Amino acid sequence: TLNCKLSKDRSGSLARESVVQKSQLLIATEIKEISARGNRSKTLLNLASAIELKWVEELFPDDITTNLECKYDPGPKRIEAFKIKRFRDLEVKREHESKVDPKAAGLALAKACLHDWFKPKSFDNNIKQQILRLNWICVARPDLEFPPFDENAVLRCLAKAFEGMTLAKQAVVANVKPSFRKHMPEAQWEWLDEFAPNTIDWPNDQPKKLHYPESPTDRNGKIIPVELHVKLHECFRLDKHPVICERHIVRFKLLTPKNKKIDFCD
């Protein structure tokens, strides 16, 4: 193949007339961007010479690192362990390893999960709502100092739940809820239920479900209100507009008796 990996997570194509097309390692003295189909650019490598890894190791010993890493293979749906040697950030050698580090395997499965290769059955709507509620209150009430559920936090929770596993089918049936619950102390979960509840009481009726936004703010940085889907005639029972988190008004999504949207009401 003419495709080559470059440093800084870049890639390029070796010139077709190059005589080092079969070399595992090479150095190109000319790198340029050219126009390609579809108004795209292409990185072309010219004037390339084959090199050996031992030369690089002798010249730049301090820039060579070797790490044991785990990667998820979507084919067999399992974790593979490798010993990877890098020159700075560029991978120059990879060897299979029989021994798998439990924490590294859990992290690799967690990354695969976030890339939608599989989904744990226990990662249900309750967890998704916890994430939305927590992220919303982090923006609505930063003074309460809740720890947000950003991507890194979700990754850590999944990695802990998958620790020691090597197969996707193991991760699919794993119970991830305890790991997510440990994201913050139990007292803070109780505060979350108080300030950003799942439901809100309704006069002479069952509690109604609150809908938290996927993103707590809009493109201008303004906090997006929490929504309540309610039929218009049900609002006549209220004597005041509901609020949560002490001062944030709940936005009503008003519906007809047949659940067709009428309008929003703040």
Ranges and model annotations:
Residues 200, 204-212, 260:
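Short, surface-exposed polybasic-aromatic patches that bind anionic ligands, especially phosphate groups
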Residues 1-3, 8, 24-199, 242-266:
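Acidic, serine/threonine- and proline-rich low-complexity intrinsically disordered segments
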Residues 73, 203, 213, 229-231, ...:
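A structural detector for beta-sheet-dominated domains
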Residues 1-36, 194-195, 207-231:
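Segments forming glycine/polar-rich beta-alpha architectures that bind adenosine-containing cofactors
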